[in-house]
UniProtKB/Swiss-Prot annotation:
It comes from the Bacteria. Its main location: cytoplasm. Transaldolase is important for the balance of metabolites in the pentose-phosphate pathway. GO terms for cellular component: cytoplasm. Gene3D superfamilies: Aldolase class I (3.20.20.70). It is found in: Cytoplasm. The active site is at 83 (schiff-base intermediate with substrate). InterPro entries: Aldolase_TIM (IPR013785), TAL/FSA (IPR001585), Transaldolase_3B (IPR022999), Transaldolase_3B/F6P_aldolase (IPR004731), Transaldolase_AS (IPR018225), TSA/FSA_arc/bac (IPR033919). Belongs to the transaldolase family. Type 3B subfamily. This is Probable transaldolase. It comes from Caldicellulosiruptor saccharolyticus (strain ATCC 43494 / DSM 8903 / Tp8T 6331). The lineage of its organism: Bacteria, Bacillati, Bacillota, Bacillota incertae sedis, Caldicellulosiruptorales.
Amino acid sequence: MKLFIDTANINEIKEAYSWGIICGVTTNPSLIAKEGRDFKEVVNEICSIVDGPISAEVISLKAEGMIEEARDLAKIHKNVVIKIPMTTEGLKAVSVLSKEGIKTNVTLIFSAAQALLAAKAGATYVSPFVGRLDDIGQNGIELIKEIVQIFRNYPDIKTEIIAASIRHPIHVIEAAKAGADIATVPFKVLEQMTKHALTDIGIERFLKDWEKVPKKN
């Protein structure tokens, strides 16, 4: 399973990319707004750091507006992927854009039916929201499993599954076990994934033992 980072914070992206573990970035209007910078400027800078898919979301609600925005965003860099909301207007836009060779990531997926429709429209990626489903008492990982099963039944479906709305390391591991192609993970969760109490204890013990090793003057 591939790992993307879900952020628009340049420092977080640089740090996570330096670990050698991420190969893409997802953003959304909320994440961009937190940075207080020009949208295109942020996307362009991210593209200069990470050589992989960079998802940038449209804000129009009508297909015509989505298509116009998408064409404009796609000009920023070859790695830009257009995030489109899962609506009937979004499906119309994805259908047109896929025929033009513009990659799309259909977001706000909360059912297998939505994922199937997005794939049929030509989406490059679908993003089921794991954490938000868990928030309302449903099982986000079960949705990932459903979509994986459906897509695997039909080899002509090339759409990749991005496990999104990741809240903690267990979500990442469960998404990997379920067969998601990608998990897009907030920086704080990536940090949590690096840590274990026994690792810290082990390092401390090694250092104490090293202090006991005789040193030549």
